[in-house]
Amino acid sequence: MAFLMSEFIGLGLAGASVLSNALLRRQELQLQRQALENGLVLKADQLGRLGFNPNEVKNVIVGNSFSSNVRLSNMHNDASVVNAYNVYNPASNGIRKKIKSLNNSVKIYNTTGESSV
């Protein structure tokens, strides 16, 4: 009887070990998924700050069978976004022209001090 009892205890411990491993694995998978989601949100946020359309970013990162050929369009170069920005921010009107004129006026000097553009 003692043999059966020890066998029973051994099986019980083995079962508990399997259950414990399963719970640890489940917890590990949850943490991995959470880290992945946080990483995706961070990446989408970074791309959004760079001026990419958040919806396009989401489609590209998460993936969508309906739109497999989605390409990111930079919102800063999107004429409709630029026009809307100019309407709501009058102070920014002509900013591209100002930047272009600034770039044109910048002189580049070589080591001998001669300017060249």
Swiss-Prot record:
Keyword Nucleus recorded: no
Leader peptide range in chain numbering: none
Keywords: Capsid decoration protein, Capsid protein, Host cytoplasm, Virion
Pfam families hit by this protein: VP2_lagovir
GO cellular component terms listed in the entry, alphabetical order: host cell cytoplasm; viral capsid, decoration
UniProt-annotated location(s): Virion; Host cytoplasm
Role description: Minor structural protein that forms a portal-like structure at a unique three-fold axis of symmetry, following binding to the host receptor. The channel formed by VP2 may allow the delivery of the viral genome through the host endosomal membrane.
Family of this protein: Belongs to the lagovirus VP2 protein family.
Miscellaneous notes: Translated by a ribosomal termination-reinitiation process from the bicistronic mRNA coding for VP1 and VP2.
Subunit relationships: Homooligomer. The portal-like structure consists in 12 copies of VP2. Interacts with capsid protein VP1.
Domain notes: The N-terminus domain points away from the virion surface.
Name of the protein: Minor capsid protein VP2
Organism: Rabbit hemorrhagic disease virus (strain AST89) (Ra/LV/RHDV/AST89/1989/SP)
